[in-house]
Amino acid sequence: MIWSLYVELGQNMWFCEDPKLDFEDAAWDILLENAVKYGINQIVLDLGEGVQYKSHPELAKEGAWSCDRVRAELERCRKLGIELIPKLNFSATHHMWLGEYRRMMSTSIYYKVCRDLIEEVAELFDHPAYIHIGMDEEGDAQFFEEMDMVHYRQGELIWHDLRYLCDCVLSCGAKPWIWADMCMYEPEAFRRHIPYDDVILSPWVYFAIRREHWTLVKSKQRYIDSNEGKMGVEYMEEAPIWQTMTREGVIAANDGYKTVPCCSVWGECEYCSDDVIEHFYNNCDKENLLGFMTAPWVRTDMKSIDNIVLSMQKLAEARAKFVESK
């Protein structure tokens, strides 16, 4: 099974463009050491502006990895038993890294840039089994107040662009991997446009699932101030996003979509990893459940390394309890 860790190389996927990467090599070294310790066999590396792309060098920021550095880290990970998977997020709420091209979304120039980058990354990563293309939270209003330009796709345009991006990946011999939002929220339309064999889905659940583990909104100020808190719910898990991901993620897997559910320590919920692995492992068709991922959603730096290690530890503990003990 896949036991994956999401890692940030680039960081310009949110709100503003930083001119310099915060990525720290010392944190990366500790991360890899602990990945081996905790049985991580795959890292999904969010590239963004963190690579000096030959096709579009204008996207790289200070501190971006050279192509030689990417190849060296790919080989380093292989020797550790870790598969390094590239990620490029093309969602309209997470594409600050595309620079001026984000303002050209759904134009011929944009499509060419997307294809150029996907093809280069496929070659650079030695033709990986998967290429993650993001596509989460497209049109999510919570991002609009912070963004300097608000535009997103909907209707047939979003399905056209998702299909195009998937086809770019498939033409490179890889399988496109996406966050499961579009399938979770529009399951019928998704099934019409994207066949079961054309994509890997990651439903993401960052709080508990078992009712006895639910998280009181009033227990933390960050919960009170969150979107869930503003809804007036008593527990974080009552919010539609978590109910939908929990329910539709299982349905999609049992319908035939290959699935890698994602947990996280981001929500500060001590039961998240356990509940996500228990729920999806016990309820999904095992043939379609490829494995699990954890995403700490922090920069790869020494300030955040403890959180990254905790993510791997929680995933390993849940794996031992609910998968290896079976």
Predicted segments, located by residue:
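Aromatic-lined carbohydrate-binding surfaces of glycoside hydrolases
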Residues: 6-200, 205
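Glycoside hydrolase catalytic-domain groove-lining segments
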Residues: 187-265
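Substrate-binding cleft of secreted/luminal carbohydrate-active enzymes
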Residues: 255-326
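Short aromatic-enriched loop/helix-cap "lid" or pocket-rim segments at secondary-structure transitions
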Residues: 144-146, 213-214, 305-306
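Extreme N-terminal starter segment of soluble prokaryotic enzymes
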Residues: 1-3
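Short acidic/glycine-rich loop or secondary-structure boundary segments that cap or lie
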Residues: 141-142, 185-188, 209-212, 268-270, ...
